[in-house]
Regions:
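Secondary-structure junction motif
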Residues: 74-96, 125, 160-168, 178, ...
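Hydrophobic hinge/microswitch elements
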Residues: 13-18, 22-26, 82-139
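Conserved functional loop/turn residues at catalytic and ligand-binding sites
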Residues: 6, 20, 24-25, 44, ...
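Central regulatory/effector-binding core of bacterial HTH transcription factors
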Residues: 1-37
Length: 182
């Protein structure tokens, strides 16, 4: 029982979250895996499937699922490759000989762009996409569902209070949503 616990919630991208946890600004963070942060411990919590989004009037909108090579004749956009998910998407596309414009920070920016264009985008299936009712979500059958993992991250070097430890244990006990093969 922890009667004096306050939660302060901050929304930030993965790298600043990891840096904040490392610096002791945050006790715990939720983010993608961030490389070269050896003082941090990343615990897999959930995943977000990488999907294709297009406008409902796009030729690909007739499909519920496709493989990546089906995108070869279409202009693609995705996250910029200076953020973890952008690096991941670029590697997946390169493996299949595909290219995309890597210029966006988040799902809202990408969906907003697709909303007004004839392009297709590769994006994580997040709740942010729900606000765009004229976009079709298409599953990628040749991309593992757990390609974009979300981790709970904490620092090995910073003091963790009993309340923070209890919260971390609660997350692991009650909130894990990992793909079956994980």
């Amino acid at each position: 029982h922890h009667p004096q616990v306050n939660f302060n919630i901050f929304h930030e991208k993965s790298i600043p979250v990891a840096e904040g946890v490392s610096a002791g600004t945050y006790d715990i963070g939720f983010c993608s895996m961030v490389e070269h942060m050896d003082d941090l411990f990343f615990v897999p919590i959930t995943y977000q499937e990488l999907i294709v989004i297009v406008r409902n009037d796009h030729p690909l909108a007739q499909y519920d699922s496709i493989e990546l090579p089906a995108l070869k004749d279409y202009a693609l956009c995705t996250y910029r490759d200076t953020i973890p998910i952008g690096k991941t998407v670029r590697a997946i596309l390169k493996e299949k000989g595909l290219e995309a414009a890597h210029s966006y920070d988040d799902e809202i920016s990408i969906a907003g762009r697709i909303n007004r264009s004839s392009k297709a985008a590769i994006v994580a299936d997040t709740p942010f996409l729900k606000q765009f009712d004229n976009l079709k979500k298409i599953h990628l059958t040749d991309v593992p569902k757990d390609t974009r993992m979300i981790y709970m991250v904490y620092s090995k070097k910073n003091f963790i209070t009993a309340a923070v430890e209890a919260f971390a244990n609660f997350m692991v006990a009650h909130c894990l949503d990992l793909p079956p093969e994980f």
